[in-house]
């Protein structure tokens, strides 16, 4: 029942165009959740990430388990295709990848612009997330789906051509000069 009250307070993330501001911040989302969700759901939410842990353990949530498996497979497919392009070996953990996943990965790897490649991958991620969207809008899984979608939208909005060029130039210059690169989180 708590999920009903939570979901009814959240603005829709469906159909947002790139020019429209995101109607809720991550902080506000977590604040609302902290007042309504139980401890177990809050613990799951606090661990939720777009990047699955290397050795993730399946959770009680079908959405989180599917997301983590799908993202891991996307990253393994990306590593495999990049390695093939460089004629290198890559351990893809004996996985087979879906045709749509491989099409997205190959399209991204062939892009000249890293930013455009990331857009292709993020579109694929959004399509995948929509494919695992829970049917029950007022469930705990829907809260996790909403959180993943919010994080993905916010991540996609952070891309900026000028900042990307500056970061690329910084990396390139550090390689050419042999200096250690400062990693920013």
Label for each model-derived stretch:
Residues 1-185:
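Extended alpha-helical surfaces
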């Amino acid at each position: 029942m708590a999920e009903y009250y939570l979901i009814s307070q959240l603005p829709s993330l469906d159909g947002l165009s790139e020019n429209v501001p995101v109607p809720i911040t991550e902080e506000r989302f977590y604040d609302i959740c902290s007042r309504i969700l139980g401890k177990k759901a809050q613990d799951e939410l606090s661990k939720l990430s777009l990047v699955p842990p290397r050795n993730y353990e399946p959770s009680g949530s079908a959405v989180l388990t599917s997301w983590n498996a799908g993202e891991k497979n996307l990253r393994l497919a990306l590593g495999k295709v990049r390695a093939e392009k460089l004629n290198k070996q890559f351990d893809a953990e004996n996985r087979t990848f879906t045709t749509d996943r491989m099409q997205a990965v190959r399209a991204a790897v062939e892009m000249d612009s890293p930013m455009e490649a990331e857009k292709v991958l993020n579109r694929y991620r959004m399509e995948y997330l929509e494919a695992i969207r829970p049917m029950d809008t007022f469930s705990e899984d829907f809260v996790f789906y909403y959180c993943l979608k919010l994080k993905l939208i916010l991540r996609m909005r952070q891309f900026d051509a000028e900042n990307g060029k500056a970061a690329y130039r910084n990396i390139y210059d550090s390689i050419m000069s042999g200096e250690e690169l400062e990693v920013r989180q």
